Amino acid sequence: MALALPEDHFDQYFAGQPHWFGKLIHYVGAADGTDLQGVGPHTDWNFLTLLLQDDTGGLQARPAGADRWIDVPPIDGALIVNIGEMLEVATHGYLVATPHRVLPCAPGGTRDSIAFFWAPRLDASLDAVTLPPAYAKQAPGVSESAHNVLHSRFGDNALKGWLRSHPEVAATHHADLLVQSHTTDGSS
């Protein structure tokens, strides 16, 4: 494996009931351009994401150290692989969860994509792996902020990500979880 780990190193975290889901995503551009649908900047809270996008485009990424967003052009039949926050935690920042976003469609246009999110069991806690010295020198640690604390226990990280992605639903139906989340991660 590229990290100089045994091929089965991460198996223990996925054994039993790994947490995965697929998502069929259909974006619609309003005919008059007033109701813009896209996805704001975020990182995926899982381990890896595989994404197949149509030929419309609109996906952008901001690689580590970049000062601007770059287009991720569709390539026929190619999958986009996004590193998730749990892989960043496991590699102590050697591999970084890439921030990405989806721009709104042109008025009257549509965009379709299929995403597969692969993650450990909800109760799995990932410890940082021991990297070879050459890699370890390039591992700055996880890139967290007060608004996005990365948890080593996947279930905690998934809940944090869900609350972040669906703030209106969380505020309406799970306000108690928002209070707990803000209390445990230091953000407000």
Walk through the language-model features, giving the residues of each.
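C-terminal flanking tails of non-heme Fe-dependent oxygenases
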Residues: 1-188
